[in-house]
């Protein structure tokens, strides 16, 4: 259940961030409201970046070697 909760938290943070961006782009907020929305957006961005960093650390590729499964860190760039 913890995995689903973390995923939902990330998804909710991302949705909230998108809504904030739309409100800011709309241009109908006062200066104070815009600053508050911007501050909230920065916090949400940091939360999302942290969640992505944690997920990246957890991602591992399982390789079969000599009949055993060995964990190898995920490499985002394919080998040339």
UniProtKB/Swiss-Prot annotation:
GO biological-process terms attached to the record: DNA catabolic process
Major localization class: cytoplasm
Taxonomic superkingdom: Bacteria
EC primary class: hydrolase
GO CC list: cytosol; exodeoxyribonuclease VII complex
Coiled coil: none
Catalytic activity: Exonucleolytic cleavage in either 5'- to 3'- or 3'- to 5'-direction to yield nucleoside 5'-phosphates
Family the entry assigns: Belongs to the XseB family.
HAMAP family xref list: Exonuc_7_S
Function: Bidirectionally degrades single-stranded DNA into large acid-insoluble oligonucleotides, which are then degraded further into small acid-soluble oligonucleotides.
Assembly and interaction partners: Heterooligomer composed of large and small subunits.
Protein name: Exodeoxyribonuclease 7 small subunit
Native species: Pseudomonas putida (strain ATCC 47054 / DSM 6125 / CFBP 8728 / NCIMB 11950 / KT2440)
Gene this protein is translated from: xseB
């Amino acid at each position: 259940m913890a995995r689903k909760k973390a995923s939902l938290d990330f998804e909710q943070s991302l949705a909230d961030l998108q809504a904030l961006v739309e409100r800011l782009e709309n241009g109908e907020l006062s200066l104070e409201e815009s600053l508050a929305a911007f501050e909230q957006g920065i916090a949400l961005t940091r939360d999302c970046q942290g969640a992505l960093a944690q997920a990246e650390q957890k991602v591992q590729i399982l390789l079969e070697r000599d009949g055993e499964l060995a964990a190898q860190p995920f490499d985002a760039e394919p080998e040339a």
